[in-house]
């Protein structure tokens, strides 16, 4: 009978967060840029479709901004109050984003 072997991957979480932070910044800036372009284009052309899509993209910018804040909070080291660190902020933000989408869909 062979012994049971356990393999724990102790990879640094911060390395993943740094890559995620870079990706989120790029996505946030691009989405914000296209949101502004759609608002200007919608106002200049009196297009309700462009203005509606820009409102949708503005909600995406808000969600990305919340994700960015959560990522920065999650990178804080543990302390006496939060002994496991601040990683739960990522989960709370994901829940809030999902809740916001549910409320918007009910409103539609």
From Swiss-Prot:
<dbReference type="InterPro" id="IPR027469">
    <property type="entry name" value="Cation_efflux_TMD_sf"/>
</dbReference>
<comment type="similarity">
    <text>To cation A.eutrophus efflux system protein CzcD.</text>
</comment>
<dbReference type="GO" id="GO:0005886">
    <property type="term" value="C:plasma membrane"/>
</dbReference>
<keyword id="KW-1133">Transmembrane helix</keyword>
<protein>
    <recommendedName>
        <fullName>Uncharacterized protein in glgB 5'region</fullName>
    </recommendedName>
</protein>
<keyword id="KW-0472">Membrane</keyword>
<keyword id="KW-0812">Transmembrane</keyword>
<dbReference type="Pfam" id="PF01545">
    <property type="entry name" value="Cation_efflux"/>
</dbReference>
<keyword id="KW-1003">Cell membrane</keyword>
<dbReference type="InterPro" id="IPR002524">
    <property type="entry name" value="Cation_efflux"/>
</dbReference>
<dbReference type="InterPro" id="IPR050681">
    <property type="entry name" value="CDF/SLC30A"/>
</dbReference>
<dbReference type="GO" id="GO:0005385">
    <property type="term" value="F:zinc ion transmembrane transporter activity"/>
</dbReference>
<feature type="transmembrane region" description="Helical">
    <location>
        <begin position="88"/>
        <end position="108"/>
    </location>
</feature>
<feature type="transmembrane region" description="Helical">
    <location>
        <begin position="24"/>
        <end position="44"/>
    </location>
</feature>
<feature type="transmembrane region" description="Helical">
    <location>
        <begin position="55"/>
        <end position="75"/>
    </location>
</feature>
